[in-house]
């Protein structure tokens, strides 16, 4: 991705993908910077914004992460990924009603979020978000 960015420093997909690579290595702060850059270049790049929100959550910036998730859902109400993320974040912060409401929407849009293997290994959510969603699914 570094080479792609040398050739085209305005490639939002390369920033997002490099952010994903850094997140996979546990370099969350570096990932956040790449996701931010991707969204600066392309403000409507919903998945870069979603990845940014998830990375914020992983770095314990919970309020900021939830605010970003809510903003994404406001703009893209059928974005199952952020509905599921809000479910998890709200559940562990004790906002049960909001968690359940977002889950109805998320599950209605994409049933894969009930499969923790998919969330962990295919979608590759951050560990803290996986734990939070698992707590919701197991009513803990």
Regions found by a protein language model. Give the residues of each.
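TPR/TPR-like (Sel1-like) alpha-helical repeat modules
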Residues: 74, 78-80, 84-114
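Conserved structural position within tetratricopeptide repeats
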Residues: 3-6, 36-40, 70-74, 108
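Terminal, low-structured helical/coil segments at or just beyond the last alpha-helical repeat
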Residues: 103-140
